[in-house]
Amino acid sequence: YEISACLVGSEMCIRDSDHYKEANKQAELYDELADLVDTAAQTNAATEPAEQIPYSEEKMLLPELAELYQQNGDLVGWISIADTNINYPVMQSVNEPNFYLKHGFDKAYSDYGCPYVQEDCDVQEPSDNLVIYGHHMSNGSMFAHLEKFKDKGFWNEHRTITFNTLTDKQEYEIVAVFRTVVYTDSPDAFKYYRFVDAESTDAFDDFIAKCKELPFYDTGVTAEYGDKLITLSTCEYSRNNSRLVVVAKRITEDGGADAAKTHAEAAAENERPN
Protein backbone atom coordinates (compact mmCIF):
# COMPACT_ATOMS: atom_id res chain seq x y z
CA TYR A 1 0.00 0.00 0.00
CA GLU A 2 2.78 2.42 0.94
CA ILE A 3 4.62 1.62 -2.28
CA SER A 4 1.44 2.22 -4.28
CA ALA A 5 0.86 5.51 -2.47
CA CYS A 6 4.43 6.59 -3.22
CA LEU A 7 4.03 5.70 -6.87
CA VAL A 8 0.77 7.61 -7.12
CA GLY A 9 2.36 10.56 -5.35
CA SER A 10 5.31 10.48 -7.73
CA GLU A 11 3.00 10.37 -10.73
CA MET A 12 1.09 13.39 -9.44
CA CYS A 13 4.35 15.29 -8.95
CA ILE A 14 5.39 14.47 -12.49
CA ARG A 15 2.03 15.65 -13.83
CA ASP A 16 2.24 18.87 -11.83
CA SER A 17 5.78 19.39 -13.08
CA ASP A 18 4.73 18.75 -16.68
CA HIS A 19 1.81 21.17 -16.31
CA TYR A 20 4.13 23.84 -14.89
CA LYS A 21 6.59 23.37 -17.76
CA GLU A 22 3.78 23.55 -20.31
CA ALA A 23 2.42 26.74 -18.73
CA ASN A 24 5.85 28.38 -18.87
CA LYS A 25 6.41 27.21 -22.43
CA GLN A 26 3.11 28.65 -23.62
CA ALA A 27 3.64 31.91 -21.73
CA GLU A 28 7.04 32.34 -23.38
CA LEU A 29 5.63 31.53 -26.82
CA TYR A 30 2.83 34.09 -26.66
CA ASP A 31 4.98 36.73 -24.95
CA GLU A 32 7.45 36.43 -27.81
CA LEU A 33 4.69 36.77 -30.39
CA ALA A 34 3.23 39.81 -28.60
CA ASP A 35 6.67 41.43 -28.43
CA LEU A 36 7.17 40.79 -32.13
CA VAL A 37 3.82 42.41 -32.97
CA ASP A 38 4.45 45.40 -30.68
CA THR A 39 7.96 45.96 -32.05
CA ALA A 40 6.76 45.80 -35.65
CA ALA A 41 3.94 48.25 -34.93
CA GLN A 42 6.27 50.71 -33.16
CA THR A 43 8.89 50.48 -35.89
CA ASN A 44 6.31 51.05 -38.59
CA ALA A 45 4.92 54.09 -36.74
CA ALA A 46 8.32 55.64 -36.04
CA THR A 47 9.94 55.17 -39.44
CA GLU A 48 9.09 55.30 -43.09
CA PRO A 49 6.57 52.47 -43.58
CA ALA A 50 8.13 49.38 -45.07
CA GLU A 51 6.94 48.06 -48.39
CA GLN A 52 3.60 46.42 -47.70
CA ILE A 53 2.88 42.80 -48.49
CA PRO A 54 -0.29 42.16 -50.53
CA TYR A 55 -2.92 39.95 -48.94
CA SER A 56 -5.41 40.20 -51.78
CA GLU A 57 -5.94 42.33 -54.87
CA GLU A 58 -7.54 45.04 -52.75
CA LYS A 59 -5.82 44.78 -49.38
CA MET A 60 -2.37 44.70 -47.81
CA LEU A 61 -1.23 42.83 -44.71
CA LEU A 62 -0.91 44.93 -41.57
CA PRO A 63 2.88 45.32 -41.10
CA GLU A 64 2.72 44.15 -37.47
CA LEU A 65 1.08 40.86 -38.46
CA ALA A 66 3.03 40.13 -41.64
CA GLU A 67 5.81 38.10 -40.02
CA LEU A 68 3.38 36.02 -37.95
CA TYR A 69 1.31 35.30 -41.05
CA GLN A 70 4.41 34.10 -42.83
CA GLN A 71 5.12 31.78 -39.88
CA ASN A 72 1.60 30.34 -39.87
CA GLY A 73 -0.90 30.91 -42.65
CA ASP A 74 -3.79 29.97 -40.34
CA LEU A 75 -3.46 33.36 -38.63
CA VAL A 76 -6.55 35.54 -39.16
CA GLY A 77 -5.98 38.34 -36.63
CA TRP A 78 -4.90 39.52 -33.20
CA ILE A 79 -7.14 40.13 -30.20
CA SER A 80 -6.40 42.25 -27.13
CA ILE A 81 -8.30 43.69 -24.17
CA ALA A 82 -6.77 46.30 -21.87
CA ASP A 83 -5.90 45.26 -18.29
CA THR A 84 -6.31 41.56 -19.04
CA ASN A 85 -4.00 38.78 -20.17
CA ILE A 86 -5.90 38.62 -23.45
CA ASN A 87 -3.30 39.58 -26.06
CA TYR A 88 -3.12 36.74 -28.55
CA PRO A 89 -3.03 35.70 -32.17
CA VAL A 90 -6.34 34.39 -33.48
CA MET A 91 -6.34 31.38 -35.77
CA GLN A 92 -8.74 29.58 -38.10
CA SER A 93 -8.39 26.10 -39.56
CA VAL A 94 -11.33 25.51 -41.87
CA ASN A 95 -10.36 21.96 -42.84
CA GLU A 96 -9.68 20.95 -39.21
CA PRO A 97 -12.25 23.10 -37.38
CA ASN A 98 -11.11 22.55 -33.78
CA PHE A 99 -7.40 22.11 -34.49
CA TYR A 100 -6.39 25.05 -32.27
CA LEU A 101 -8.42 23.74 -29.36
CA LYS A 102 -5.41 21.55 -28.57
CA HIS A 103 -2.61 23.13 -30.61
CA GLY A 104 -0.65 26.33 -30.13
CA PHE A 105 0.34 28.95 -32.68
CA ASP A 106 3.34 26.81 -33.59
CA LYS A 107 0.96 23.90 -34.36
CA ALA A 108 2.50 21.80 -31.60
CA TYR A 109 0.10 19.92 -29.31
CA SER A 110 -0.89 22.02 -26.30
CA ASP A 111 -3.62 21.86 -23.67
CA TYR A 112 -3.65 25.65 -23.84
CA GLY A 113 -4.49 25.79 -27.51
CA CYS A 114 -4.79 29.18 -29.17
CA PRO A 115 -7.83 31.44 -29.65
CA TYR A 116 -9.55 30.51 -32.89
CA VAL A 117 -12.47 31.48 -35.08
CA GLN A 118 -15.34 29.08 -35.75
CA GLU A 119 -14.86 27.38 -39.11
CA ASP A 120 -18.01 28.73 -40.81
CA CYS A 121 -17.16 32.36 -40.06
CA ASP A 122 -15.55 34.57 -42.72
CA VAL A 123 -13.15 37.03 -41.11
CA GLN A 124 -12.39 39.03 -44.26
CA GLU A 125 -15.90 39.35 -45.72
CA PRO A 126 -16.80 39.53 -42.80
CA SER A 127 -19.64 37.39 -41.45
CA ASP A 128 -22.27 39.15 -39.38
CA ASN A 129 -20.91 37.39 -36.29
CA LEU A 130 -17.37 36.12 -35.77
CA VAL A 131 -17.36 33.49 -33.02
CA ILE A 132 -13.96 33.25 -31.30
CA TYR A 133 -13.15 30.49 -28.81
CA GLY A 134 -10.46 30.42 -26.15
CA HIS A 135 -9.71 28.17 -23.18
CA HIS A 136 -10.39 29.26 -19.60
CA MET A 137 -7.05 28.27 -18.06
CA SER A 138 -6.56 28.09 -14.30
CA ASN A 139 -3.41 30.24 -14.51
CA GLY A 140 -5.39 33.14 -16.00
CA SER A 141 -4.19 32.70 -19.57
CA MET A 142 -6.10 32.48 -22.84
CA PHE A 143 -9.71 33.70 -22.29
CA ALA A 144 -9.76 33.20 -18.50
CA HIS A 145 -9.82 36.96 -17.90
CA LEU A 146 -13.20 37.25 -19.59
CA GLU A 147 -14.33 36.43 -16.04
CA LYS A 148 -13.49 40.03 -15.16
CA PHE A 149 -16.44 41.15 -17.25
CA LYS A 150 -18.87 39.59 -14.79
CA ASP A 151 -18.13 42.72 -12.75
CA LYS A 152 -19.97 45.74 -14.13
CA GLY A 153 -17.33 47.99 -12.63
CA PHE A 154 -14.64 46.35 -14.76
CA TRP A 155 -16.78 46.59 -17.88
CA ASN A 156 -17.46 50.25 -17.14
CA GLU A 157 -13.72 50.96 -17.47
CA HIS A 158 -13.13 48.49 -20.32
CA ARG A 159 -15.95 48.80 -22.81
CA THR A 160 -14.07 47.90 -25.96
CA ILE A 161 -12.19 44.98 -27.51
CA THR A 162 -9.51 45.30 -30.16
CA PHE A 163 -9.61 42.65 -32.87
CA ASN A 164 -7.33 43.43 -35.78
CA THR A 165 -7.69 41.23 -38.83
CA LEU A 166 -4.75 40.61 -41.15
CA THR A 167 -5.69 43.72 -43.11
CA ASP A 168 -7.74 46.04 -40.89
CA LYS A 169 -7.51 47.53 -37.41
CA GLN A 170 -10.87 47.19 -35.70
CA GLU A 171 -12.45 48.18 -32.41
CA TYR A 172 -15.56 46.58 -30.93
CA GLU A 173 -17.91 47.88 -28.26
CA ILE A 174 -19.33 45.37 -25.78
CA VAL A 175 -23.07 44.81 -26.12
CA ALA A 176 -23.68 42.01 -23.61
CA VAL A 177 -21.89 39.69 -21.18
CA PHE A 178 -23.73 36.53 -20.16
CA ARG A 179 -23.45 32.84 -19.36
CA THR A 180 -25.46 30.02 -20.82
CA VAL A 181 -25.31 26.25 -21.21
CA VAL A 182 -24.47 24.33 -24.37
CA TYR A 183 -24.77 20.75 -25.64
CA THR A 184 -28.27 20.42 -24.22
CA ASP A 185 -31.88 20.93 -25.25
CA SER A 186 -32.62 22.63 -21.95
CA PRO A 187 -34.92 25.65 -22.36
CA ASP A 188 -32.27 27.90 -20.83
CA ALA A 189 -29.67 26.86 -23.42
CA PHE A 190 -28.73 29.54 -25.94
CA LYS A 191 -26.91 28.23 -29.01
CA TYR A 192 -25.26 31.57 -29.77
CA TYR A 193 -22.60 29.88 -31.89
CA ARG A 194 -25.18 29.01 -34.54
CA PHE A 195 -25.68 32.67 -35.42
CA VAL A 196 -23.07 33.55 -38.04
CA ASP A 197 -24.90 35.35 -40.86
CA ALA A 198 -28.31 36.93 -40.39
CA GLU A 199 -30.85 35.73 -42.92
CA SER A 200 -33.00 38.77 -42.21
CA THR A 201 -33.41 41.80 -39.99
CA ASP A 202 -35.66 39.73 -37.74
CA ALA A 203 -33.00 37.03 -37.35
CA PHE A 204 -30.43 39.62 -36.30
CA ASP A 205 -32.84 41.33 -33.93
CA ASP A 206 -33.79 37.98 -32.38
CA PHE A 207 -30.15 37.19 -31.67
CA ILE A 208 -29.55 40.55 -29.99
CA ALA A 209 -32.79 40.24 -28.02
CA LYS A 210 -31.70 36.86 -26.67
CA CYS A 211 -28.31 38.28 -25.68
CA LYS A 212 -30.17 41.03 -23.83
CA GLU A 213 -32.28 38.51 -21.89
CA LEU A 214 -29.26 36.86 -20.25
CA PRO A 215 -26.67 39.48 -19.25
CA PHE A 216 -25.08 40.02 -15.86
CA TYR A 217 -25.93 43.73 -16.25
CA ASP A 218 -27.31 46.19 -18.79
CA THR A 219 -24.61 47.85 -20.88
CA GLY A 220 -27.03 50.31 -22.45
CA VAL A 221 -25.52 49.30 -25.80
CA THR A 222 -27.42 47.49 -28.54
CA ALA A 223 -26.84 46.55 -32.17
CA GLU A 224 -28.94 46.66 -35.30
CA TYR A 225 -29.05 44.80 -38.59
CA GLY A 226 -25.98 45.74 -40.61
CA ASP A 227 -23.67 45.90 -37.58
CA LYS A 228 -20.79 43.43 -37.46
CA LEU A 229 -20.34 41.41 -34.27
CA ILE A 230 -17.75 39.33 -32.51
CA THR A 231 -18.68 36.75 -29.89
CA LEU A 232 -15.98 35.61 -27.46
CA SER A 233 -16.67 32.26 -25.83
CA THR A 234 -14.95 30.38 -23.01
CA CYS A 235 -15.82 27.77 -20.39
CA GLU A 236 -17.64 28.91 -17.24
CA TYR A 237 -17.56 26.63 -14.22
CA SER A 238 -20.68 27.49 -12.20
CA ARG A 239 -22.50 24.51 -13.77
CA ASN A 240 -21.94 21.73 -16.28
CA ASN A 241 -21.43 22.73 -19.92
CA SER A 242 -21.67 26.41 -19.05
CA ARG A 243 -20.09 29.10 -21.22
CA LEU A 244 -19.17 32.71 -20.55
CA VAL A 245 -19.92 34.84 -23.59
CA VAL A 246 -19.05 38.41 -24.53
CA VAL A 247 -20.79 39.90 -27.57
CA ALA A 248 -19.52 43.15 -29.08
CA LYS A 249 -20.22 45.23 -32.19
CA ARG A 250 -17.71 46.83 -34.51
CA ILE A 251 -17.46 50.59 -34.09
CA THR A 252 -14.44 51.41 -36.25
CA GLU A 253 -12.23 49.78 -38.85
CA ASP A 254 -9.13 51.88 -38.32
CA GLY A 255 -8.50 51.41 -34.63
CA GLY A 256 -9.62 54.98 -34.00
CA ALA A 257 -9.71 55.63 -30.26
CA ASP A 258 -11.92 58.66 -30.78
CA ALA A 259 -14.77 56.55 -32.13
CA ALA A 260 -14.48 54.11 -29.24
CA LYS A 261 -14.36 56.94 -26.74
CA THR A 262 -17.42 58.56 -28.27
CA HIS A 263 -19.46 55.37 -27.94
CA ALA A 264 -18.27 54.74 -24.39
CA GLU A 265 -19.02 58.31 -23.33
CA ALA A 266 -22.49 58.11 -24.87
CA ALA A 267 -23.22 54.97 -22.87
CA ALA A 268 -21.91 56.64 -19.73
CA GLU A 269 -24.17 59.63 -20.32
CA ASN A 270 -27.17 57.29 -20.54
CA GLU A 271 -26.32 55.90 -17.10
CA ARG A 272 -26.15 59.29 -15.38
CA PRO A 273 -29.26 60.47 -13.56
CA ASN A 274 -31.01 63.51 -14.98
Residue ranges and their predicted role:
Residues 11-274:
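Solvent-exposed, non-transmembrane regions of membrane-associated and secreted proteins
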Residues 1-13:
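Short, small-residue-biased leader/transition segments that mark boundaries at the very start
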